[in-house]
From Swiss-Prot:
The keyword S-adenosyl-L-methionine does not apply. GO terms for molecular function: aminomethyltransferase activity; transaminase activity. Belongs to the GcvT family. GO terms for biological process: glycine decarboxylation via glycine cleavage system. HAMAP family: GcvT. InterPro entries: GCS_T, GCS_T_bac, GCST_C, GCV_T_N, GcvT/YgfZ/DmdA, GcvT/YgfZ_C, TrmE/GcvT_dom1. The keyword Transferase applies. The glycine cleavage system is composed of four proteins: P, T, L and H. Keywords: Aminotransferase, Transferase. This is Aminomethyltransferase.
Length: 364
């Protein structure tokens, strides 16, 4: 299994290590519950160095990325980032990603760990007609997420630039704990926070400095378990669970990142799909504390209407919550049932998204 540059730090903190997409990663350090609460009330810190980073350089870098992704990258100012998906020719989602516009001829793409090789090969295969160079810098890049309502105030102690001046989905290159880093106001938790992209060799030093800050405020390191709970509470989608190449962005509530007034791979398929969207992703609150798993059937009046894509117990809400891909006829307020193994049916109410709205900044 692969290890991030912070592996020894996790082991030293007594983390429960697990295999995630071929990476040995911390599931939790003390408990998922405590780590979720730290993110919600103060700060949680995540090692997300398993994510993939691609550097795209050249005079046609912007137009190339604009062709690859469904969102509008061409009009993005320097120093801004954008969330999007990449689709195949059939409109199926290859991956979701964040793209940073560094300059008119340079951009950074951050992709999911399980898709690094697939994405890189797919991106390269579409580059023939563009004057660009594509570098996979994943192995030499570390990524640390510092998330929670006290993130800005706490992190500022170690950052030379003013964090208040970094708007949501903006970034700048700065010095963090004496080390060069790209600091972005982004995250996957539903809280305000920052992600620090830096050279892998510098990661342990920065991690130690951040740990010292956490000890002052009752913050804590957080593992993949807390990350998954936080993202589900905030109703952020997870690739491979809530979406994949068998789903298109219009079905899973991502039509806001699809700009059909520009050209991109999969546009024609999505124009057709827009005429006839048969499924949608909905939020469910289940009765009781049992956790609905991916693939469990969802029923309405005894008839199958879809299936669970993600489920977990929400410590923040004190409820079992889930996302489900269901028939378009299902609406907020509907009473459904989830079929658990053994035939047990558990009641589930369709609720508005998101389940939880935290301190995350809304203005871009």
């Amino acid at each position: 299994m692969k290890r991030t540059p912070l592996f020894e730090k996790h082991v030293g903190l007594g983390a429960k290590m697990v295999d995630f997409a071929g990476w040995e990663m911390p599931l939790y350090y003390t408990s998922i519950f405590e780590e979720v609460m730290a993110v919600r009330k103060s700060v949680g810190m995540f090692d997300v160095s398993h994510m993939g980073e691609f550097l795209v350089k050249g005079p046609e870098a912007v137009s190339f990325i604009d062709f690859l992704i469904t969102n509008d990258f061409s009009s993005l100012p320097d120093g801004k980032a954008i969330y999007s998906v990449m689709c195949n020719e059939n409109g199926g989602i290859i991956d979701d990603l964040v793209v940073y516009k560094v300059s008119p001829d340079e951009a950074l793409m951050v992709v999911n760990a399980a898709n690094i090789e697939k994405d890189f090969n797919w991106i390269k295969s579409h580059s023939k007609n563009f004057d660009v160079e594509i570098l996979n810098i994943s192995d030499t890049t570390a990524l640390i997420a510092f998330q929670g309502p006290e993130a800005q105030e706490t992190l500022q102690e170690l950052v030379e630039d003013s964090l208040e001046e970094i708007a949501y989905y903006s970034f700048r290159k700065s010095i963090v704990a004496g080390v060069e880093a790209l600091v972005s106001r982004t995250g996957y938790t539903g809280e305000d926070g920052f992600e620090l992209m830096l050279e892998a060799k510098d990661a342990p030093k920065v991690w130690d400095a951040l740990m010292n800050l956490l000890r002052k405020i009752d913050g804590r390191p957080a593992g993949l378990g807390a990350r998954d709970v936080c993202r589900l509470e905030a109703t952020y989608l997870l690739y491979g669970q809530d979406m994949d190449e068998s789903t298109n962005p219009l079905e899973v509530g991502l039509s806001w990142v699809v700009k059909l007034d520009k050209d991109f791979v999969g546009k024609e398929a999505l124009l057709k799909a827009k005429e006839k969207v048969e499924r949608k992703l909905v939020a469910l609150e289940l009765s009781g504390k049992r956790i609905a798993r991916k693939g469990y059937e969802v029923l309405k009046n005894g008839e199958r209407v879809g299936e669970i894509t993600s489920g977990n117990f929400s410590p923040t809400l004190g409820k079992s919550i889930a996302l489900a891909l269901v028939s378009k006829s299902v609406k907020v307020g509907d009473q459904l049932e989830v079929a658990f193994p053994g035939g047990k049916l558990v009641e589930a109410l369709v609720v508005k998204k998101p389940f939880y709205r935290g301190s995350v900044r809304r203005e871009v």
